[in-house]
Amino acid sequence: MLLSSLILHWIMLALQAQSQEAGLHAIFQTDQGQFTTELYFERAPRTVANFVSLAEGSRPWLDLEEGKIRQEPYYNGLGFHRIASGFVIQGGSPNGLGNDGPGYTFKDEFHPDLRHDSAGILSMANAGPNTNGSQFFITLAPTPFLDEVHSVFGRVVEGMEVIERLGNVPVVTHPLLGKTDTPITAPIIQSITLERQGELANQFNPLKISPALPRIEAIESRIFLTAQGDIRVAWDPLLGAKEYFYASTDMQNWSSIILPPQGEVSLMSLMQSYPIIMAKLIRATADP
């Protein structure tokens, strides 16, 4: 009888542990320690799909500085560029200024059960409605005024002491931006490892989410000379897309502009200043 009770108790504990571990988790390894987040892939599927595919390097993204389409782990080596004591820690900005991302944006995703109701909430940073990209933050306290403004997609389940440590990193006022939450030395995300437990988590494919997330792709273009002697570049524009023109004289340093929607621009003034240039066009499709 005692043996049966012990076996039953062990089975119940095992099932309880299994249910607690089931899900999709992101393990952050930083230079300040390790912490683990649970990702809400059932209630915020598109936001989680974006984060997971960037973290594991399965989704192409645009290196805005070099004008390269990359498909490699996005967050490795990036810092927490914002440390707002008692509020949030924020990361996911390649240039460390908080004004960039993966080259595309996607829409907000709100769920009535997902709220900024405690410390350790994982949520998307944005520059206004429907401007999500790669930047995220983790709360250091309840922040209910962020509900329905920022998309919650996870929470810290292990390592809150590391989050608290990150939240106490010394900061200074940024000399150019004037922000008072710039870390003297930004803590670094060394890697993010994704772990799946359970059937639903294993079935979740971030590349087969519906509606699909925006794509980064090269644009086919053609250069031609008009009867008036103007050198122009033309391409087939895609409605709603953000289309980039990158130019370089040495293949090392690139400058970029956002292309106009009409699908044709003059290169004359550029080529008068730089007779030999390399150019490439890249597109971020619109979020459906």
What is each residue range found by the language model?
Residues 1-14:
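Bacterial N-terminal signal peptides
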Residues 15-246, 251-253, 259-278, 285-288:
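Cyclophilin-like peptidyl-prolyl cis-trans isomerases
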